[in-house]
Amino acid sequence: MKSLWMLSASFFFSLMAVFVKMGAEDFGTFELIFYRSLAGVILLYTFIRSRGYTIRTPYLFGHFKRSFIGTVSMSIWFLSLTMLPVGTSMTLNYTSPLFLSSFMVVILLMRKQPMPWGLLSCIVLGFCGVVLVLQPSFSSGQMLGAMLALASGFLGSVAYWQIKELGQLKEPSWRIVFYFTVFGTFYGLLGNLFLEGGLSPITLDNIGYLIGMAVCATCAQCSLTLAFGQGNVLLSSCLQFSAIIMAELMGLFFFGDALSLTTEIGIAVIMVSGVCATMLTRRQQTKP
């Protein structure tokens, strides 16, 4: 099942976050977006030329929508991180699977098709696991940050839906990611020049962080695009929660972050929801 590529995406996104955290002391946010995207352009264009593929597409506007919405979603999430505790911001950002489920429910109701209550329940269960792991908290004066994080989750779901539409148009995953990285390159560079005062020096001490971040980001985006573009949207949404598990494990192994009992219970809940969603989807696909 193509949706299982989401597990690969979650792993690489979590590993990318490790490199971002290590390089954050030397580079600004827009600068990291620029280097991450630029390396993706170089890697993917090299792959495209070596295989004799083409970047020409009749769906250029669709690629622009996916890239623009996805980049805006990422940007306002970064902004929400400056206004909210990390756990709260991430929890609200991970409402995107809930929004995707809502889109699917509306479409199925309009088409008068049967509702996949089992998968929808797994997504809700997985989100409950995310809440247990991240343990969000609010205080007065954080409404703007909460709205931004929630908007990021909504826009993220719209971007994922756009990936699904491009996949249905037979656009290959590498082309979808290529245009996303091209957009991110210009966006990151302009943001850096106007808001961060220019690029920081690259040294032997920090270049490894950039390379690791760029390779992981490219692999993660390709995997995510395969999952949403060619897989089951609801299953991919549910498996997206696995990124929370992998991020916690990365924090444990690389930074010595301790796991509380509540976190461990939340991880177990996310794992159960993912396994159940996979089994339900496989059973549905094997029905005559």
Where are the regions a protein language model picked out?
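Hydrophobic/aromatic residues within transmembrane alpha-helices
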Residues: G23, L32, R36, S80, ...
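C-terminal transmembrane-helix exit sites in multi-pass transporters
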Residues: P97-L119, I245-E264
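Hydrophobic transmembrane alpha-helices of multi-pass small-molecule transport proteins
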Residues: M115-Q135, T262-T281
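Membrane-interface helix-cap regions at the ends of transmembrane helices
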Residues: V41-Y59, C128-S140, G184-N206, A277
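Transmembrane alpha-helical segments that form core, pore/gating elements
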Residues: V18, L44, S137-E196
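Loop-to-transmembrane-helix transition segments
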Residues: M1-A9, R49-F78, L144-S152, N192, ...
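Helix-helix packing/entry segments at the starts of transmembrane helices
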Residues: S89-T95, K170-F183, T218-F253
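C-terminal-most transmembrane helix of multi-pass membrane proteins
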Residues: L239-P288
